[in-house]
């Protein structure tokens, strides 16, 4: 998670916050590279702790959600309390297919759709704090659809077009994909094997 960020002067598009939660643990290397190349300074919420959990409790609508999902509320609140005005937390049904022999690469329904829960449960909080909460449905497992959807999503940013998004994705795949994602996955696998 310790990745170099653009300085405030270098960040031509400003700051974007990413919560350190659920599937963002695995996907963060990609999103950090993606937003950095677009010119955003990326701010990541800190590691989970009791204070973060308790700070978000007032917006948890269901006691039946799993503990990791409940943590999301506190991470979002931390970003808002640290004056982050744009937060990105996408809904992702399918992850990148890492193992061709696996029967699927589908996220559990809570992981896939929890950004929608956050949007509904924290809408007033976002409004009161003038925060833009970005939670698009992203086809993370299909490069061409990903490029199309992310370009549509960012159509409010003047010069983020299809080619820009495609080039960032291509650059990430070549430069960082094997290094960041592969090494990160290996670290996880190594920990699982040794523990």
Show the residue positions of the predicted features.
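An N-terminal assembly and electron-transfer interface module characteristic of large anaerobic redox
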Residues: 1-195
């Amino acid at each position: 998670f310790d990745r170099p960020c653009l300085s405030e002067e270098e960040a031509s598009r400003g700051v974007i916050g990413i919560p350190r939660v659920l599937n963002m643990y695995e996907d963060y290397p990609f999103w950090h590279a993606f937003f950095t190349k677009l010119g955003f300074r990326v701010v990541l919420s800190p590691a989970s702790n009791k204070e973060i959990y308790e700070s978000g409790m007032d917006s948890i609508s269901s006691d039946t959600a799993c503990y990791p999902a409940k943590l999301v509320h506190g991470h979002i609140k931390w970003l808002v309390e640290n004056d982050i005005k744009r937060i990105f937390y996408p809904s992702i049904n399918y992850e990148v297919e890492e193992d061709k022999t696996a029967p699927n690469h589908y996220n559990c329904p809570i992981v896939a759709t929890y950004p929608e829960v956050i949007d509904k449960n924290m809408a007033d909080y976002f409004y009161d704090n003038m925060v833009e909460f970005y939670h698009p449905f992203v086809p993370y497992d299909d490069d061409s659809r990903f490029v199309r959807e992310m370009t549509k999503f960012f159509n409010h940013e003047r010069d983020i077009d299809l080619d820009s998004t495609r080039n960032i994705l291509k650059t990430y795949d070549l430069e960082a994909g094997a290094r960041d994602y592969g090494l990160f996955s290996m670290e996880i696998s190594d920990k699982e094997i040794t523990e």
